[in-house]
């Protein structure tokens, strides 16, 4: 009972966040059991199957939800894979790195799947899934580029912020090199501007392992 309540609470929070992002109302599903009927919002039901959605902009709110769900599912079963479904244009680097670090921190393998778009930090998180378990659907688009940023204020403050952006660019390039097998200098060249790829191109590049047309294919 407590487990179901925790799942419901986590998923309701995610469902509320998705609604605030303008993604519409969250549908409900009803399950029959020997104890009667039980209604779940769709994300609660999928969370029971160890499926997490990372949809929309990467920000602190979505990062906190994904991190919480990863930690919860690890506590439920540290040996069973977690699936992370991604449809995101990217967003905050710090929020993305929080999710990346947690994906590496938890014991279960985190399988990633791109549906629609995985751009910027969305593509970074897609590539950060467990090796051999990173997927994209046939018409998905994946885009990598260098981190974006702006600065204002005194010259010394602008210099500090510029150094931080350069550090983040180097760190992200290093991680992408590790997960794709591409040399760091090639990653740096390829992310200098927006670099869009199809699923097959992303597979060839090393961002994903397989393009899935059908489940179990």
Curated annotation (Swiss-Prot):
It holds the Pfam family CLP_protease. GO terms for molecular function: ATP-dependent peptidase activity; ATPase binding; serine-type endopeptidase activity. Gene3D superfamilies: 2-enoyl-CoA Hydratase, Chain A, domain 1 (3.90.226.10). It is found in: Cytoplasm. The active site is at 120 (nucleophile), 145. Its EC number is 3.4.21.92. Its main location: cytoplasm. Keywords: Cytoplasm, Hydrolase, Protease, Serine protease. It catalyses: Hydrolysis of proteins to small peptides in the presence of ATP and magnesium. alpha-casein is the usual test substrate. In the absence of ATP, only oligopeptides shorter than five residues are hydrolyzed (such as succinyl-Leu-Tyr-|-NHMec, and Leu-Tyr-Leu-|-Tyr-Trp, in which cleavage of the -Tyr-|-Leu- and -Tyr-|-Trp bonds also occurs). One of its GO terms (biological process) is protein quality control for misfolded or incompletely synthesized proteins. GO terms for cellular component: cytoplasm; endopeptidase Clp complex. It comes from the Bacteria. HAMAP family: ClpP. Fourteen ClpP subunits assemble into 2 heptameric rings which stack back to back to give a disk-like structure with a central cavity, resembling the structure of eukaryotic proteasomes. Cleaves peptides in various proteins in a process that requires ATP hydrolysis. Has a chymotrypsin-like activity. Plays a major role in the degradation of misfolded proteins. Belongs to the peptidase S14 family. This is ATP-dependent Clp protease proteolytic subunit. The lineage of its organism: Bacteria, Pseudomonadati, Pseudomonadota, Betaproteobacteria, Burkholderiales. The gene is clpP.
